[in-house]
Design a protein with these regions (language model features):
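Anionic group-transfer/hydrolysis microenvironments
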Residues: 9, 69, 81, 97-100
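ATP-dependent phospho-/nucleotidyl transfer catalytic cores
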Residues: 9-65, 69, 87, 149, ...
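Internal, well-ordered alpha-helical scaffold/interface segments
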Residues: 58, 62, 78, 91-97
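C-terminal catalytic region of ATP-dependent kinase domains
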Residues: 83-194
Length: 194
């Protein structure tokens, strides 16, 4: 199986505190830190004291928009958070990590072929699923519907920040150069991301 490794950003004495552990100390809810209700996440971001709440909200919505673009169905409270430097007693937002649930990772050759041959199958994987792990009023958010609804001004601003930074030609070139992928996988990922 092809995997991707990233640099260890907890080196040099930095400690990762995932948002789940922070949220758990802030809100008294039945799901504790693991609950992904959008309103609870927003409230926790306001109440946490690691970084400026507005900066954190901006990061969250930027990450949400990119997750929507990549079809990440698993951005829960345990895979984003803060880095705390015990030497300086300073905290910063951790780099984005754990994106293993992007780009339909369970799609085998049969699924890829079906999606490439049937526009309805492709559209279903863009407009219907995957959904976000974040919930709104108890239901997982459908990325497309949420982004098109413009119901969150902060999300709308993130769209305006992120979309101009997406350079499809560079992404397509990157995907084409990924080693170990079959021709089918190259075609599938390039089609899906487009």
């Amino acid at each position: 199986k092809v995997v991707c490794a990233c640099k260890d950003f907890t080196a040099n004495g930095k400690i990762l505190y995932d948002f789940c552990s922070i949220k758990n100390t802030i809100l008294d809810s039945e799901h504790g830190g693991t609950g992904t209700e959008l309103s609870d996440i927003m409230e926790s971001m306001e109440k946490q004291q690691f970084v400026n709440p507005n900066t954190l909200k901006q990061h969250f919505w930027n990450m949400f928009v990119v997750d929507a673009f990549l079809g990440n169905f698993d951005r829960h409270n345990g895979n984003w958070g803060f880095l705390f430097d015990s030497a300086t007693q300073n905290a910063e937002i951790a780099p984005v990590f754990d994106c293993g649930s992007c780009l339909l990772p369970q799609a085998d050759d049969k699924v890829m072929e079906r999606v490439l041959q049937d526009e309805d199958e492709l559209n279903a994987r863009i407009f219907q699923f995957p959904t976000s792990a974040v919930k709104d009023q108890g239901r997982k958010i459908h990325y497309y519907d949420f982004l098109m609804s413009k119901k969150s001004e902060d999300c709308n601003k993130a769209l305006m920040r992120i979309v101009p930074r997406i350079h499809m030609d560079e992404i397509q070139n990157f995907l084409q150069e990924v080693p170990y992928l079959s021709d089918l996988q190259h075609t599938f990922y390039q089609t899906y991301i487009q």
